[in-house]
Amino acid sequence: MRRNVLPSFLSFFVKSVCLALLATVWFLNPQLIHKANAAGAEPWRITKEAWSEADERGYSEFVEAIGRADCWNVDDCFESTANPFRSRHGRFSFRADCADFPYLFRAYYAWMNGLPFAFQNGVLPQSGWTRDIRYTRNGNKVVSRKAVPATANGVNAASILVDLRSAISTGSYRHHAIANSSSNFTDMYSPRIDRDGIRPGSIVYDVNGHVVLVWRVEDDGRVLTVSAHPDNSVSRSFYGRNFLRTHPRLGTGFKEWRPIRLVGARRLANGTLVGGRIEALPNEALPNYSLMQYIGTETIDTSARTLDQWRQATFARSGEALDYYHFVRAAMASGDLTMDPVKEIRSSMRSLCYDIRARKQAVDAAIANGIDRMAAPNRLPQNIYGTFGYWEFYSTPSRDARFKTALKEQRDHIEALIAMHAQGASTVTYAGTNLIGDLLEAYDDESAQCITYYTRSNGTNVQLSINDVIDRVFDLSFDPYQCIERRWGAQPGEEQSSCRDTPVKDTWYKAERFLRNLIDRTYDVDMGYTPRELEAGPHGQFSGRGIVEAPDVDVRAYLISLQQRQQASVVVPEAR
């Protein structure tokens, strides 16, 4: 066992260095990317000792405005009219992936409002070594922190934002929910699940390596989210079953920013604060701190034993037992939760439209940068969902898996609502007379309103509705080295005929079908296989080679089957 420690450390060290170098190049090489240039920007002067409740409300409003804006790129969002501070940051190219995105929002708002800001810039595994700090089995611990210096003339905010990109990864969120150090404290804490504890600006961490910002909480309890991706694109969705519950040591789920204060600073005549140190409120001093999302609503016991039994946690609302995700929806609703199935399917279709639109940006970026014209690799990355280099920036396995999970959730949710309506559940409201027909009509209407175009390799355009994409969802290639026709799941025939992939890439596409059938991401299994090894199996959820049969995620097909059953059950009287 001992002989594995050093190689594991070296592997982690080399990857960390490579990632840091990549981040540096990303910011500083003007030939490859936008240059981070904050010419004409205001310096970051700290004039407030702490964030007030008014500041927090202002931050929530800022996040909500950006979330609501029609922007699909990080830089475009911060340069949009939704940003009231856009005239003050000078010439600066904003870049972020999902992990950096919440920190970029928080730091930027602090800069524009003279607020203190600090962040954890070093994390290590809670125990043992790891090949990738983002996917440790027992979570991470904070080992170092950095604060924006409080100086008389202010500091260059651009340098802070660049530091964030090299310091923050999804591993920065992977810490125990009870972590409570006074010195190396975590930037965030676990909040109470209600409309006071979760609001625009709150964060959700997905154990499978994704982070989103809450940008709105609807009156019906739906939590709307916005996130960034390695290609700098922005996507919008909503909180649901694609965010898995886990042991609290991994810190998954909802998070809120921990309040900090600049202590011991000297105030100059112009109001600028100089010197001092950053302190944070401990968990016990936070009115919204809660482990409810891990232990449930029916106990206040936070012992290690209870935390270890997180799978047995129970959730209830107004005396009614609910599964966790239904509970979140009910707890976040304004008043008693009621769901109209027709409105629910429309909302989910609009979210899917956002997902498809964001995916188009990712695919187009790979094509624009010529990744599809590069030779196929000999084998896949060690894990296709979390890696480095071209694959990390231009592939879409995680994005595609989240999309398929959203489809599965849509199907299961509508099926449950139909059953609840049939049982007369008070939480389901429907005023019509033909629920199945109205659901199909709403589905088709939303599908037709969301049209995506892609340009084939021969320059002609293909038009896809939401339903078209769903029909071919398990044929959508996540592999950036493949032609755009395969990235959009073109079937053999006219549409696929313009694909210029080599026979080697043909072999890859066929072998990767097992991985395309997956909807659950597995970051802790080896997936670095060749096409022959993928074909040979064994296949299974945790095999690293994918599964043979794709799950049923097609809600329209389900509704059609119900409609046909209804029609078949109608007795036609004999003619007399």
What do the PLM-derived regions correspond to, one by one?
Residues 2-18, 31:
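Bacterial N-terminal signal peptides that target proteins for export
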Residues 24-34:
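C-terminal segment of classical bacterial N-terminal signal peptides
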Residues 37-170, 178-183, 266-576:
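Mixed-charge, low-complexity intrinsically disordered regions
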Residues 185-193:
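Active-site neighborhood of thiol-dependent amide/isopeptide-bond enzymes
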Residues 192-199, 204:
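Short, well-ordered loop/turn sites that connect or cap secondary structure elements
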Residues 207, 215-237:
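Catalytic Cys-His active-site segments of thiol-dependent hydrolases/isopeptidases
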Residues 233-279:
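Glycine- and charge-enriched low-complexity intrinsically disordered segments
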